[in-house]
Amino acid sequence: MLPSRRKAAQLPWEDGRARLLPGGLRRKCSIFHLFIAFLLLVFFSLLWLQLSCSGDMAQVTRGQGQETSGPPRACPPEPPPEHWEEDESWGPHRLAVLVPFRERFEELLVFVPHMHRFLSRKRIQHHIYVLNQVDHFRFNRAALINVGFLESSNSTDYIAMHDVDLLPLNEELDYGFPEAGPFHVASPELHPLYHYKTYVGGILLLSKQHYQLCNGMSNRFWGWGREDDEFYRRIKGAGLQLFRPSGITTGYQTFRHLHDPAWRKRDQKRIAAQKQEQFKVDREGGLNTVKYRVDSRTALSIGGAPCTVLNVMLDCDKTATPWCIFG
């Protein structure tokens, strides 16, 4: 990590018809020989398919159906070891990239390979966790990040809260361990859309210790927006210093923003009391109160980049937050 790249925030995410049988077949081959060859082909094809499916299913864990609330639970199995495990030049720290997600598959196909290459060039040990919300409630980015924190393995010691539609382009951006305090990679001076001083969204790095100190994020924010503003107040309330990049000269060209609002509109509705509640600090809820279950955990490779997809069912207290329901 280069100290010069961080500053404290100043305040007030052969032939196409290839032969099917070894050695080919003569034109005058008997029907009996053709039949035997066909049976052999079917047998070996089924054998290959069985072995292939067995290998894939070994990567999928299903049936984790019991509801989970808060952190008093053992961490899930480790992700597959990456190539840097025995290379000390990658450093001692390992990053869990937490990606809240719903239905943006075209963005995910770009994000995972890009981030894996970007972090690998910077020699950052990492694993990408895609937190796919599969329930019927409105999208809850903050609760998904809480789930990602709890479900990421013990081998990671810091997290990146990372939007799937925000890609870093400048190689000088620092994704190293944020020992001094939370590090806001997508600072207001660099983010292509959001420029207010208290903004901490897009991409934010925290040590797991500091995230616990904040009690994670509030689970009350259903729909798009405002959860980051509440988390900023949690950071300050925990007595943590927020840091941002310094010496980056690419301005608003520092990131590529994938989201197309004309194609995929955001859920920005404010229903009933949500209009007032969105500006309050949730002093009781957070990491310790998130309720969910993981329906499945799948190890994938997208464009050669490894990641883990968790299908997450969030739970909503409709009395406390009736705005979790569409309409």
Swiss-Prot record:
Record membrane topology: Single-pass type II membrane protein
Gene Ontology CC annotation, any one: Golgi apparatus
Transmembrane segments: 31-51
Entry EC number(s): 2.4.1.-, 2.4.1.133
Cytoplasmic side: 1-30
Glycosylation sites: N154
Cofactor: Mn(2+)
Topology Lumenal: residue spans: 52-327
Keyword field: Glycoprotein, Glycosyltransferase, Golgi apparatus, Manganese, Membrane, Metal-binding, Signal-anchor, Transferase, Transmembrane, Transmembrane helix
GO biological process, one term: carbohydrate metabolic process
Disordered: annotated span: 61-88
Coiled-coil positions: none
InterPro entries: Galactosyl_T, Galactosyl_T_C, Galactosyl_T_N, Nucleotide-diphossugar_trans
Reaction equations catalysed: 3-O-(beta-D-xylosyl)-L-seryl-[protein] + UDP-alpha-D-galactose = 3-O-(beta-D-galactosyl-(1->4)-beta-D-xylosyl)-L-seryl-[protein] + UDP + H(+)
Family matches, as Gene3D superfamilies: Spore Coat Polysaccharide Biosynthesis Protein SpsA, Chain A
Pathway assigned in UniProt: Protein modification; protein glycosylation
Name recorded for this polypeptide: Beta-1,4-galactosyltransferase 7
Name of the gene encoding the protein in the UniProt record: B4galt7
